[in-house]
């Protein structure tokens, strides 16, 4: 037995979160930093870590540490963070930038490869529930956590589609270590894709989009040009 086994504590945290014990689960989730693989994602920063205290004269840098989906889910906590510090800088890059440019609680969206130099404290995004001491009944954004930003207009007119339209994502990032349990071949959805009354929308880009465009389902599945997550949100 190893009471300090980081991976065991990490999986225990996930189980607690699954059971709805958010306070204990998020607290236990801090064990992820004992995992060398996860620790490698932590940027080299010389500022002090923020502990959730009131610091009205300090600028806080918040950095994402995991995937796009985790970032989108956890930005809901930024307005509450903004109530405790003078200024919030969110370090972000890539296709999420257009989506988060007007996110509530963010004073500056930093897009550089290295962190902005103008901050005194820092915190990882996924630690915010613990730092804010969130319980299940205090989680913000339960009815929608992405306000209406300045969405890009969709590339095609959607008026010709029926009221019920189904967006489909069938593959994740191939480099993910659990990709074998997260991704499927499009052919698995054949019984549903063959239903004439059901219009589909592909929410995939890259090679998966090309697969649809060269498949027999092309006529019944719209493939909008999803250049970034703001466009995707607008399509949804």
Regions found by a protein language model. Give the residues of each.
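Alpha-helical solenoid repeat scaffolds of the TPR/TPR-like class and their adjacent stem/linker regions
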Residues: 1-236
């Amino acid at each position: 037995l190893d009471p300090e086994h980081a991976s065991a504590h990490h999986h225990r945290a996930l189980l607690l979160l699954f059971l709805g014990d958010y306070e204990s689960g998020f607290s236990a989730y801090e064990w992820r930093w004992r995992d060398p693989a996860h620790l490698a994602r932590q940027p080299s920063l010389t500022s002090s870590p923020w502990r959730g205290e009131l610091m009205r004269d300090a600028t806080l840098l918040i950095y994402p540490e995991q995937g796009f989906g985790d970032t989108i889910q956890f930005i809901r906590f930024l307005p509450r963070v903004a109530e405790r510090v003078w200024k919030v800088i969110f370090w972000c890059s890539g296709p999420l930038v257009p989506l988060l440019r007007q996110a509530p609680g963010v004073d500056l969206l930093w897009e550089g490869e290295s962190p902005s130099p103008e901050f005194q404290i820092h915190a990882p995004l996924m630690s915010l529930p613990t730092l804010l001491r969130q319980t299940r009944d205090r989680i913000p954004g339960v009815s929608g956590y992405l306000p209406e930003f300045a969405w890009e207009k969709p590339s095609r007119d959607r008026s010709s589609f029926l009221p019920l339209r189904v967006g489909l994502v069938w593959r994740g990032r191939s480099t993910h270590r659990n990709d074998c349990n997260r991704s499927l071949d499009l052919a698995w959805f054949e019984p549903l894709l063959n239903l004439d009354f059901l219009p589909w929308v592909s929410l995939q880009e890259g090679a998966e989009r090309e697969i649809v465009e060269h498949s027999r389902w092309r006529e019944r599945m719209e493939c909008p040009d999803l250049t970034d997550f703001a466009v995707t949100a607008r399509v949804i």
